[in-house]
Amino acid sequence: DDGYISRVTVSSTGYGNGLYITHPDGTTSIYGHMHNFSPEIARLVKERQYETESFNVNIVLDSDVFPVQRGDYIGNVGNSGSSAAPHLHFEVRQPDGSGPVNVISAGYFEHRDDVPPEIRRVNFYSYEDSTGLVQSELIKSFRGSSSKPLRVSDKFYVAVDAIDRQRGTPGKLGIEAYEFFLDGESVYRFELGDYTYKEQETFNSLIDYREMVRSGAVLVKSLVEPGNGFTSKITSANNGVFCLDDEDVHQVKVVVEDLDGNKKVANFKVKRGINASEDTLKYERALPWFAPYAFARKGVKVSLPVMSLFRSESIEIDTVDVCGEFYS
């Protein structure tokens, strides 16, 4: 809707050619990776580039310089900045700049979604923390439901890789809510909603980060680590750890839900029958997640501010002799 261009940026990285439009309700819409600006905006950019003798510019404008209305031409979609292919980065930010607005739930676009999400993988992991340092191993990975009882450790957790789809677009969309059940009782529920950039910094605490690095898959896990920044959006029992104290067969249900309430369910049976890994960690020092950490010895210095870690970790330090022969 109506507003004014409040900022224009040009950079060889990031958004490249970017426009920021501030609206009467205080929100700011962002248009990144543009190919070009309208002639009036391009003229202003060129003047500032000559004035500063710099290609990169960041121009902040008052409300009376470039007022705009719906339908006005501001530029073309492009591939500028840190972009792998032509597209428009469109984003709306909250009035206080603390985070993005969910443009679908806020009604910026009309859409009809009756397509349920797609579960691509469900992983089961053993869990052991008797030493204060969590140890876990992958027990088994599934592509969907399984009726055969899976033998698990008496403590375990679950993670799921899922995406959402909508009719009329091949794009892969995010999941709005994840929930894990044991015998019908909720063990973990995470509902995204609106979030802040501060919360976004701890996104890796929600997922199996090691698996994302290894394969690129993003699996949201039931395990709630102590440094998780999304705890206000999470309801869990026993920090998302499933606990079995008998030899019976138990039911595990995984539910993912999109913004329109469409759900996909995967069901599993589990039975206690394997031991979690014993404490075989070999480490020199333990790094607490809740405190700053500093360590130094000849040739090595480690310094971590408080809350650098999502959970306490171990560290083993070794040195490599670099005085050997080198060849050109």
Locate the predicted segments by residue:
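Zn2+-dependent peptidoglycan hydrolase active-site motif and core
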Residues: 2-61
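A structural signal for short beta-strand/turn segments enriched in small hydrophobics and glycine
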Residues: 3-5, 65-77
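Short, charged beta-turn/beta-strand-edge "cap" motif at the junction between a beta-strand
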Residues: 10-13, 74, 78-82
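Active-site loop architecture of trypsin-fold serine endopeptidases
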Residues: 18, 77-88
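Predominantly extracellular/luminal regions of secreted and cell-surface proteins
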Residues: 291-315
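Long, low-complexity serine/threonine/glycine- and acidic-rich segments characteristic of extracellular
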Residues: 39, 69, 112, 125-274
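Proline-centered linker/hinge motifs at extracellular inter-domain junctions
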Residues: 100, 114-121, 293
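Proteolytic processing hotspots in large secreted/extracellular or virion-associated proteins
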Residues: 277-280, 316-328
